[in-house]
Amino acid sequence: MSIAQNKKAFHDYFIEEKYEAGIVLEGWEVKAIRAGRVQLKEAYIVIRRGELFLIGCHISPLPTASTHVNPDPVKTRKLLLHAFQIKELIGKVERAGYTLVPLDMHYKAGKIKLEIGLAKGKKQYDKRESEKRKEWERDKQRLLRMRHS
């Protein structure tokens, strides 16, 4: 079940491969995510010292958050993957000019997971081409429905 999606990533990037990663979260963050108070729109992933980190993911604390905890909505969060996956991603990002983007936050066996995509940036004309293709598919479906009615 999806919690939050980053639809803008599919508009701005060609997604080559997808990986599923765990996230290191605090208790108040888990509660806020379960309440749907998370946003991936401005988020991105960086590599530091051989580890992956999610930056810019906004998790709004619940008003009932504890007073002894100082919640930071946009703090850097560590991502958890197997070592061989991290090495593979680092190699592709450093050599081939790829970038890592968060695509979807979802539940898997009661745990919160983040789907990340190995992506290559789209140029402006690629974005326009994708938009035209989507529009044509919509028009084609509309014409087929009208013909069969």
Curated annotation (Swiss-Prot):
GO terms for molecular function: RNA binding. Keywords: Cytoplasm, RNA-binding. It comes from the Bacteria. The keyword Transmembrane does not apply. Residues 123-142 have a biased composition (Basic and acidic residues). GO terms for biological process: trans-translation. The keyword Translocase does not apply. Residues 122-149 are annotated as: Disordered. CDD domains: SmpB. GO terms for cellular component: cytosol. It is found in: Cytoplasm. Belongs to the SmpB family. Required for rescue of stalled ribosomes mediated by trans-translation. Binds to transfer-messenger RNA (tmRNA), required for stable association of tmRNA with ribosomes. tmRNA and SmpB together mimic tRNA shape, replacing the anticodon stem-loop with SmpB. tmRNA is encoded by the ssrA gene; the 2 termini fold to resemble tRNA(Ala) and it encodes a 'tag peptide', a short internal open reading frame. During trans-translation Ala-aminoacylated tmRNA acts like a tRNA, entering the A-site of stalled ribosomes, displacing the stalled mRNA. HAMAP family: SmpB (MF_00023). This is SsrA-binding protein. It comes from Nitrosomonas eutropha (strain DSM 101675 / C91 / Nm57).
